Amino acid sequence: MLELKGRGAIVAGTRRIGSAVVKRLAREGVNLAIVYRSSRDAADALHASVRDGIERACVIQADLSSAQDVKRLVDMAERQLGELSFCVNLASDYPRTPYQLLTAADWDRAMAAAKGAYLLALESSRAMQRNAGPTRGHIVFFGDWAAEETPYRDFLPYLTAKAAVHFMTRAFALELAPHGILVNAISPGPTARDPALVSSAEWKAALAQAPLHRESSEEEMAELVATLLKLETVTGENIRVDSGRHIGGTMLDDEEPGA
């Protein structure tokens, strides 16, 4: 298993689950590049909370849908951290739009997130190839439990983009295996309800469909990330952390999505 201490990691999308991931990796002694798109204050606060416990940490602004921005981000992270072993990409919007209101702009917005996942994996993997050892790096995408065969309503472009991320996980894993780089995905189910998107009633309905009837915690996701990064023979996997909701299926009739 890999020793994480002293290795460099990019973590993109550092609010909610991403914040927990940054804090968990900091406890392992991982040097961190905290990447944000527009929430500078939140990124700075997160940086301040971890910088004293690790050797190196930095905050970098980037638009992941821009190839130029992503290349600049990876180059800067590698310089600031000394080397780059890990990339954890949680950057994604969660736009809820009823089918009747969908437009081309909704599709473009969702596909921009998938493009960002592709670009960041591409550039970070090229940096990882400069590392020594049989395991040179590890990329972790974040998907969605429902982006396989069980979609829920009102999130069509978002779930389509996440399905692309799931396929990218396997494709990148195959391409990068000869270079000693592992690629996996984590797909959360109901985790830390956002009241602006999901009502209490909808949340209860979502949990009722999960066999365990429990929501996952941000800390549980972060623990899984830390564990995955230590492993050296797991690649191409999509791990669903959803209390078994994918077994229960999607919501039908007049029920509303809650994840």
Regions found by a protein language model. Give the residues of each.
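A glycine/serine/threonine-rich, flexible loop-to-helix segment
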Residues: L174, P178, A185-A210, E215, ...
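Substrate-binding pocket helix/loop in short-chain dehydrogenase/reductase
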Residues: P98-Y99, A105-A110, A206
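C-terminal substrate-recognition "lid" of short-chain dehydrogenase/reductases
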Residues: S217-V241, H246
